[in-house]
Amino acid sequence: MNGRPSVFTSQDYLSDHLWRALNA
């Protein structure tokens, strides 16, 4: 997990993965 702070919510985690997947 890079580019993200140590503390984040599961929603941010999912949103980040979805965004990365869509913009891969």
Swiss-Prot record:
Keywords: Leader peptide. GO terms for biological process: translational attenuation. Coiled coil: none annotated. Changing D12N: Eliminates arginine-specific stalling of ribosomes at the termination codon. The keyword Plastid does not apply. Pfam families: Leader_CPA1. The keyword Heme does not apply. Belongs to the arginine attenuator peptide family. Arginine attenuator peptide (AAP) that has a regulatory role in the production of arginine-specific carbamoyl phosphate synthetase. Encoded by an upstream open reading frame (uORF) within the 5'-leader region of arginine-specific carbamoyl phosphate synthetase small chain (arg-2) mRNA, it attenuates the translation of the downstream arg-2 ORF. In the presence of high concentrations of arginine, ribosomes translating the uORF encoding AAP stall at the termination codon, resulting in reduced translation from the downstream arg-2 initiation codon. This is Arginine attenuator peptide. It comes from Neurospora crassa (strain ATCC 24698 / 74-OR23-1A / CBS 708.71 / DSM 1257 / FGSC 987).
